[in-house]
Amino acid sequence: GHVPHEPIRSARESVEFQRPQHRRAATNRSVTASAAARVARGKWAEDLVSRWYQQHGYVIVARNWLCKRGELDVVACKDAVLVVCEVKARASNAFGTPAEAVTPAKQLKVRRATADFRQSLRASSDPIALLVNSARTVRFDVACVLGTQLEMLEDIF
């Protein structure tokens, strides 16, 4: 049989609609309700974890600290111990527990971001920087928020 070189089009169809740029431009780029709920849940969980640390005598040093190598959710300090906490929030266990989401790759990113965080404060005389620089130990915690329940896993990696 004969195979045409051009796609078969109706007389009213335009070639313009075949371009990939047009198809990409037509996608919906707005934030979905589920994405907005996820962001709100994450912020609520970070607020909950920050309050937990404060109630236990820690000073919150930083929240959502960003660098090229990652993000630190909550950084706190107490008794010369710098605590870096990765916060994982889930509405349910349907896709695994919050702790299971902290993979070895994520742990490495957090460790590298922590090194960048400490380096960024080395030369500073800011009171927070002095507190961070006086820390002799770094501890990595994971805060698991499932629904409204908080479980703290201290010194987990």
Predicted regions: what they are:
Residues Y53, L72-P98, V110:
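Conserved catalytic cores of phosphodiester-cleaving nucleases, focusing on short active-site segments
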